Amino acid sequence: MLSASLWPTSVEAKAQAPEATAVDAVVKHYAALVHANYEDSVTSAKTMQKAIEAFLAKPSDKAFLEARKQWLAAREIYGQTEAFRFYGGPIDGEDGPEGQINAWPLDEAYIDYVDGDDNAGLINDANVPMTVEQLAEMNERGGEENISTGWHAIEFMLWGQDFSDNGAGNRAYTDFVDGERANADRRRQYLKLVTQLLVDDLQSLVDAWAPGKADNYRADFEKGGLESVRKIIVGVGSLSRGELAGERIEVAMNTQDQEDEHSCFSDNTHRDAVTNAQGIQNVWLGTYQRLDGSKMVGASLADLVATKNPALAKKTTKQIAESLAAAEGIQTPFDREILGDASAPGRKRLQRTVDSLTAQSKDLVEAAGAIGITKLTLTEPE
């Protein structure tokens, strides 16, 4: 979940804007890349859904582990899409589903039983109707940690609370078996519904970015010229500093509390960092490795900046690659990496990632100036 302030950053334009045809090529390829990434996210989420429904139909330890495996696989795709946020697009505009898809951290007791309270959560409250509409209505009701939907609600159902510094949560599959844990039927129903809602929300993003439609977001975005390029840079710049470096790494470093991990139940936070960094690189270079193994390549921000300042484009490309490498160097479990003082190896790895992401956000602001974009509003940590 984003809880950050807006930081207006002004840069002097060093050159005139690039040719309109070059700008349009970048904007159109970006739109195609966004659509492809969301399309793959739906596909992988449906694979996860199939595994979850197979488990719910016949609960077993093997089926439970398969559902977890498919959640992790689907996150690899979704994490890259976070580079498309922060400019009021379909994902997080006024009516966007981001808070329903990926809100965190969540209060486990809002959903289900927790250590010390077997009756906690909406699952154990028979007065709460089990419908998609009700779950959506309850999301963030009464507090931003009252999360009832999305990736992390599903994650909590699959792993349960994490009490270990050395591993993930270890919810028993028998929580979903009648007679083994109270309200197992509601637990099954909840997991099925919250998974369907996630798939539906992701599909709405595919539709918003679908080609060939006259009245969706993509149709207007592709006509936006340099304003659309500004939005693209706001997205990757804000994810670089405000969200990934700030909210997702620095906050946990400061508190040294595993509750501030992004994916704390599954211990997948290290991969969240990598996929976010990969998403930024995808946008900058105009490349994307699809779920089927094919690779998209096209006009990119890097190409556009290189027409005005080749050295800056090269520098930014190098810095973004360094950030991805630093993120890949973060070890698991993340809740061990955040412990200790500044000299601890894990904290050094995290700080290296933060420093690189901070540097690349500055490069991106400079890159915007090089192509005639004089003002940006990036997200900064509070």
Describe the function of each predicted region.
Residues 7-14:
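Sec/Tat signal peptide C-region and signal peptidase I cleavage site
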Residues 1-5:
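Bacterial N-terminal signal peptides
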Residues 16-382:
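Mature extracytoplasmic or organellar-lumen-exposed domains after removal of signal/transit peptides
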